[in-house]
Amino acid sequence: MLHVEMLTLVFLVLWMCVFSQDPGSKAVADRYAVYWNSSNPRFQRGDYHIDVCINDYLDVFCPHYEDSVPEDKTERYVLYMVNFDGYSACDHTSKGFKRWECNRPHSPNGPLKFSEKFQLFTPFSLGFEFRPGREYFYISSAIPDNGRRSCLKLKVFVRPTNSCMKTIGVHDRVFDVNDKVENSLEPADDTVHESAEPSRGENAAQTPRIPSRLLAILLFLLAMLLTL
């Protein structure tokens, strides 16, 4: 009898976990590949932007060269996350923080890749939490600067939850620099420009809350088992 009730408990827990998920979440995450170098035509236009959903990924690929290319001909960058003003002026000094550093152009293992997951919650004190309906901004500065003012910048719009359709599958979909050139979803007038600050304090330790129905069922079944 106890064995049957334990199986029932496990079944109910699994059922509640499945059906208590956010309806806007996706079974498959999209990955957006961005090649961070000055020869990328989308950076040259100055309006490079992508639209993502919560739980999607941004994969940034650093410049990479053959060994025959001299050091002074390679590109190196420090990438920053900034606010809207920093994005507009391409200035990370006023309001921004360092995200990644592309400093190994001759890496023997291929180009350096950095990934950003657009998640609502992060367990890391220096991680970043993203919100649907808001814009986020990345810029870079060259290493060394040498007085050059070339500005590479990227704008990311996190779509509202209701515009992210559920997807069924088992593999991530990958979009490279030539995919999704036309972006049909432009931010609405009420789009919020998110301030570039890493999550700290209370927000850094947040995790999705357990649904109250699930907690009540677990407590009820636990009480039943204790009375046996």
Swiss-Prot record:
Propeptide feature ranges: 204-228
UniProt feature, compositional bias: Basic and acidic residues: 190-200
Residue ranges constituting the Ephrin RBD domain according to the UniProt record: 29-162
InterPro entries: Cupredoxin, Ephrin, Ephrin-A_Ecto, Ephrin_CS, Ephrin_RBD
Pfam families in alphabetical order: Ephrin (PF00812)
Assembly notes: Binds to EPHB2. Interacts with EPHA8; activates EPHA8. Binds to the receptor tyrosine kinases EPHA2, EPHA3 and EPHB1. Forms a ternary EFNA5-EPHA3-ADAM10 complex mediating EFNA5 extracellular domain shedding by ADAM10 which regulates the EFNA5-EPHA3 complex internalization and function.
PANTHER family the UniProt entry points to: EPHRIN, EPHRIN-A5
Record's function text: Cell surface GPI-bound ligand for Eph receptors, a family of receptor tyrosine kinases which are crucial for migration, repulsion and adhesion during neuronal, vascular and epithelial development. Binds promiscuously Eph receptors residing on adjacent cells, leading to contact-dependent bidirectional signaling into neighboring cells. The signaling pathway downstream of the receptor is referred to as forward signaling while the signaling pathway downstream of the ephrin ligand is referred to as reverse signaling.
Protein name: Ephrin-A5
